[in-house]
């Protein structure tokens, strides 16, 4: 099932390891992304984007009922069974080790994209070493009734390091700095290639969207593809939804692309953004004008790599 619904393969994923995967619609457009962890030979733990959780489950149920009824596979939502939280940052391993004593969180025991299962006050515990923020990070899953206790224990263990809760806006800022795509980029119009993820696609053709994804309209070299954007004047702010034009072009129509996500980067001391621009990476080093008609804005921006920080990490 996983090899059919994800564009990348999962058959060779070892037990105890996770993999990032991307699902396509029948027409080859990106549907959703997330990670799936192999718990056992025939058991997997799948996560999706928040917005598409119900849609993904519905999609899997439809495919199993109507398209592949011969597959002996069952899918079940376990969202209500787990309390989930993420801890990220340079001290995350130290804090987690203090909060959950007795667990080996070393690189050897829990490598990147690895799984560790254990017990938390008599409740099931799963720790995944995954990072959406670009920092050393862990996803902690505890049996639902133990969620508050686990949360408090993490806060207590992290007090000496200044651990603070962070919400979706902070997480959004971190993911933009790392060039990670989310809902604004996976908007029902983009392909794997548009998002810089084409290398993930398996060479086989047995997954949903593989055939129609090769249509000429979806493989044109002038399609809008993911880029990074930085204001030429560091004091100016980009706006999400702004239309991108070339310097000197009349600010009318659909332009050359659009700004999809924007955040202020404390590290870089300026606003940065992700966008979809005709020519994609080939436009890096050039300038565009981000025009937001309703706000009366026309901001000059440099086209750069979508990975603003630590491209090797």
Residue ranges and their predicted role:
Residues 1-43, 47-66:
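Extended, compositionally biased flexible segments
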Residues 39-313:
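Conserved, structured C-terminal
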């Amino acid at each position: 099932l996983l090899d059919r619904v994800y564009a990348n393969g999962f058959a060779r994923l070892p037990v105890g390891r996770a993999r990032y995967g991307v699902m396509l619609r029948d027409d080859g457009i990106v549907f959703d992304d997330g990670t799936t962890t192999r718990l056992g030979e025939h058991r997997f733990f799948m996560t999706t984007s928040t917005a598409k959780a119900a849609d993904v489950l519905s999609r899997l149920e439809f495919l199993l009922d109507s398209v592949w009824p011969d597959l002996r596979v069952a899918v079940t939502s376990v969202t209500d069974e787990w309390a989930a939280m993420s801890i990220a940052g340079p001290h995350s391993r130290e804090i987690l080790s203090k909060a959950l004593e007795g667990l080996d969180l070393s690189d050897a025991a829990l490598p990147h994209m690895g799984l560790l299962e254990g017990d938390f006050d008599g409740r099931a515990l799963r720790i995944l070493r995954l990072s959406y923020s670009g920092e050393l990070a862990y996803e902690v899953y505890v049996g639902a009734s133990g969620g508050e206790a686990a949360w408090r224990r993490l806060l207590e263990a992290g007090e000496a390091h200044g651990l603070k809760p962070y919400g979706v806006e902070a997480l959004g800022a971190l993911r933009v700095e790392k060039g990670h795509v989310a809902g604004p980029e996976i908007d029902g119009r983009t392909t794997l290639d548009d998002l810089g993820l084409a290398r993930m696609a398996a060479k086989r053709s047995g997954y949903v969207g593989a055939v129609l994804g090769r249509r000429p309209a979806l493989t044109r070299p002038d399609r809008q593809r993911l880029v990074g954007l930085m204001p030429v004047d560091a004091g100016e702010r980009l706006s999400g939804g702004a239309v991108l034009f070339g310097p000197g072009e009349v600010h009318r129509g659909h332009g050359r692309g659009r700004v999809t996500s924007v955040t202020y980067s404390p590290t870089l001391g300026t606003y940065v953004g992700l966008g979809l621009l005709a020519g994609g990476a080939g436009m890096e080093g050039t300038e565009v004008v981000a025009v937001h008609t309703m706000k009366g804005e026309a901001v000059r921006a440099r086209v750069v790599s979508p990975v603003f920080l630590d491209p090797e990490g």
